[in-house]
Amino acid sequence: MKKEIIKWSKDFETGIKAFDDEHKILVKTLNDIYNLLNEGKRDEAKELLKRRVVNYAAKHFKHEEEVMEKYGYPDLERHRKTHEIFVKTVIEKLLPKIEEGSENDFRSALSFLVGWLTMHIAKPDKKYGEWFKEKGIVIEDEAVKID
């Protein structure tokens, strides 16, 4: 039986469909990784984390930042910085821990990712959603596709 380490909630919705769809992909990916770990498929979980969390998140961040820049979102630089710190943390700290560490290290890294994503969507991402809504800006973009 599949379990969820993170459950999508309406509370995560930014009001920008493309970004919400991308966030749902990231949430599903974290749940898929969690289930692979529970099934003893650590190598598959590692590959999924690298392919989807690292690569897809980078595409998602770029998409968000491009839209923010296009419309003059005033908190773009701070938002961009949170993305940069996240990527640096994942590459420099979490990936080595996942590659070389124990299953508990992997689960700890996964917990960090869940916590970060939850907080990031619920606060800074919701903030830009509110800003776009206040300005009456409707984003018609499509969600970034999964590789």
Curated annotation (Swiss-Prot):
GO terms, molecular function: iron ion binding; oxygen carrier activity
PROSITE patterns with a match to the protein in the record: HEMERYTHRINS (PS00550)
Keywords per UniProt: Iron, Metal-binding, Oxygen transport, Transport
UniProt cross-references to Gene3D superfamilies, sorted A to Z: Hemerythrin-like
UniProt-listed Pfam families: Hemerythrin
InterPro entries to which the protein is assigned, alphabetical: Bacteriohemerythrin-like, Haemerythrin_Fe_BS, Hemerythrin, Hemerythrin-like, Hemerythrin-like_sf, Hemerythrin_metal-bd
Binding site for Fe cation 2: 64, 79, 83, 120, 125
Binding site for Fe cation 1: 23, 60, 64, 125
Role this protein plays: Oxygen-binding protein. May be involved in a storage mechanism or for delivery to oxygen-requiring enzymes. The oxygen-binding site contains two iron atoms.
Cross-referenced NCBIfam families: bact_hemeryth, hemeryth_dom
Assembly, per entry: Monomer.
Family from the record: Belongs to the hemerythrin family.
Protein name listed in UniProt: Bacteriohemerythrin
Species in which this protein is naturally found: Methanocaldococcus jannaschii (strain ATCC 43067 / DSM 2661 / JAL-1 / JCM 10045 / NBRC 100440) (Methanococcus jannaschii)
